[in-house]
From Swiss-Prot:
SUPFAM superfamilies reported for this sequence: Carbamoyl phosphate synthetase, small subunit N-terminal domain (SSF52021), Class I glutamine amidotransferase-like (SSF52317)
GO biological process, one term: L-arginine biosynthetic process
Residues the record marks as active site: C260, H350, E352
Protein name from the UniProt record: Carbamoyl phosphate synthase small chain
GO molecular function: ATP binding; carbamoyl-phosphate synthase (glutamine-hydrolyzing) activity; glutaminase activity
Self-association state and partner proteins as the record states: Composed of two chains; the small (or glutamine) chain promotes the hydrolysis of glutamine to ammonia, which is used by the large (or ammonia) chain to synthesize carbamoyl phosphate. Tetramer of heterodimers (alpha,beta)4.
Limits of the Glutamine amidotransferase type-1 domain: 184-376
Chain positions covered by the region annotation CPSase: 1-183
A GO CC term assigned to this protein in UniProt: cytoplasm
Family: Belongs to the CarA family.
Length: 376
C-alpha cells in the first residue's frame, strides 16, 4: 500500500495512505467539525491555502454532485484534505461520482487512514499551524519535509482575497419575471460563496458581484441600494484597500452588510483591530448570542481571525456610535458589529449556511428592510 504523511510545523508526523491526488500540498492545518457538508467545505474559497482535517470519522459517503459546490465552476479551494475513513463508493441519488475521483480530477492532494482525533487534539492545544501532505514522489526524509513545511508563508499577514476574487464583474439576476428587481446590491467578492447571491436573488435583488480591487467610484456608477462584503480567506489586517473602500461607503450613507471576512473589514473600518485565533471556529453548530434580543442562533462558521472586543461593547467611530452586537456563546469571541443607527451591520458567521443551519437567514431580510428605509 502506498504511503502518505501529514507533517506539522512543530515536527509532528502522522502516517497514512494517499487519498485523492498524490504529490505535495502545503498550507495551514485547520480542522472542521461539521458532520456533513464536506462538498461545501472543500469548495468554500475561505479555505484557500488551508489543509482541512475532517473530525467526522467517515467522509465521502454521499459522493460528489453538481449542485452543492460553493464556488463557481465547482472549484475545490482547499490546499489539502485529511480524513480518517473515506467511503469507497458514493451512496446518494444526486451523486455524479465519488469524492476521491473529484479530488484526483482537481489534483487535490489528500491523506486518509490517520488518527484525525489525535491531529485535532494536537491543533486544539498547539493551535493551527503550517503543514504539508506528502505522498509518492514528494516523500523524503522527515527533516526535509519539515523544512519544506516551515519555509511556506504564514497565514498571519497573508493577503489572499485577490487570489480568490472574480477577475471580472458579473450579475446574478433576481428570481421572478425578467428585468424586474426590488433592489440592486453591489457585492464585493473577497471569496464569496455561491449561495449568497442566491439568497439575494430569492428576495428579488439584482446582485452585481465585483472584484476585490473595485473602487468606490465603480460602485457608485451602479447606484446600488446597498453594498455587501463577502467572506474570504487570509489576514484581515492586510486588507487596507477594502477597509478604505468600506469607509467611503459608510461616508456616503449607503446601507452595508458584511459576512465573515466582511465582518472583520467593517470592524476595522470602524476602528477595531483583529487578531489570529488559536485554532479558529470551523463547523456548523456554533452558538451565537444576539445581545439586542438575548436570543441564540446555531450557526455555520469558518474563520481563523476575529475582531478585538467584548459583548455589548460600545465605541465611537467617525460614522457615529457602534456596538459589538453578537458574541460566541462558547468563548466570547466577537461575532458581529453594527452602527447604532442601523445603516451598517455585519456578522462573523454564515447566515447563508451551505452547509449548516438556517437560524440566521433572517439577516438577509434585515438587510432588505435597511435598503427599503425601514431599518434606519
Amino acid at each position: 500500500m502506498s504511503k502518505a504523511v501529514l507533517v506539522l510545523e512543530d515536527g509532528r508526523v502522522f502516517t497514512g495512505r494517499p487519498f485523492g491526488a498524490t504529490g505535495q500540498a502545503l498550507g495551514e492545518a485547520v480542522f472542521s467539525t461539521g458532520m456533513s457538508g464536506y462538498q461545501e467545505t472543500l469548495t468554500d474559497p475561505s479555505y484557500h491555502r488551508q489543509i482541512v482535517v475532517a473530525t467526522a470519522p467517515q467522509i465521502g459517503n454521499t459522493g460528489w454532485n453538481g449542485e452543492d459546490s460553493e464556488s463557481r465552476g465547482e472549484r475545490i479551494w482547499v490546499a489539502g484534505y485529511a480524513v480518517r475513513d473515506p467511503s469507497p463508493r458514493a451512496s446518494n441519488w444526486r451523486a455524479t461520482g465519488t469524492l476521491e475521483d473529484e479530488l484526483i480530477r482537481q489534483r487535490i492532494v489528500g491523506i486518509a487512514g490517520i488518527d484525525t482525533r489525535a491531529v485535532v487534539r494536537h491543533l486544539r492545544s498547539r493551535g493551527s499551524m503550517k503543514a504539508g501532505v506528502f505522498s509518492d514522489g514528494a516523500l523524503a526524509e522527515p527533516a526535509d519535509l519539515i523544512a519544506r513545511v516551515r519555509a511556506q508563508q504564514s497565514m498571519l499577514g497573508a493577503d489572499l482575497a485577490g487570489e480568490v476574487s472574480t477577475a471580472e464583474p458579473y450579475v446574478v439576476e433576481p428570481d421572478g419575471p425578467p428585468g424586474v428587481s426590488r433592489f440592486t446590491v453591489a457585492a464585493l467578492d473577497l471569496g464569496i460563496k455561491t449561495n449568497t447571491p442566491r439568497n439575494f436573488a430569492r428576495r428579488g435583488i439584482r446582485c452585481h458581484v465585483l472584484p476585490a480591487s473595485t473602487t468606490f467610484e465603480q460602485i457608485a456608477e451602479l447606484n446600488p441600494h446597498g453594498v455587501f462584503l463577502s467572506n474570504g480567506p487570509g489576514d484581515p489586517a492586510t486588507a487596507d484597500h477594502v477597509v478604505a473602500l468600506t469607509r467611503e461607503v459608510l461616508g456616503a450613507g449607503i446601507p452595508l452588510f458584511g459576512i465573515c471576512f466582511g465582518n472583520q473589514i467593517l470592524g476595522r473600518a470602524l476602528g477595531l483591530s483583529t487578531y489570529k485565533m488559536v485554532f479558529g471556529h470551523r463547523g456548523i453548530n456554533i452558538p451565537v448570542v444576539d445581545h439586542a434580543t438575548g436570543r441564540v442562533a446555531v450557526t455555520a462558521q469558518n474563520h481563523g481571525f476575529a475582531l478585538q472586543g467584548e459583548a455589548g461593547q460600545s465605541f465611537a467611530t467617525p460614522f457615529g456610535p457602534a456596538v459589538v452586537s453578537h458574541t460566541c456563546a462558547n468563548d466570547g469571541v466577537v461575532e458581529g458589529v453594527k452602527l447604532v443607527d442601523g445603516r451598517a451591520f455585519s456578522v462573523q458567521y454564515h447566515p447563508e449556511a451551505a452547509a449548516g443551519p438556517h437560524d440566521a437567514e433572517y439577516l438577509f431580510d434585515q438587510f432588505v428592510e435597511l435598503m427599503a428605509g425601514e431599518g434606519r
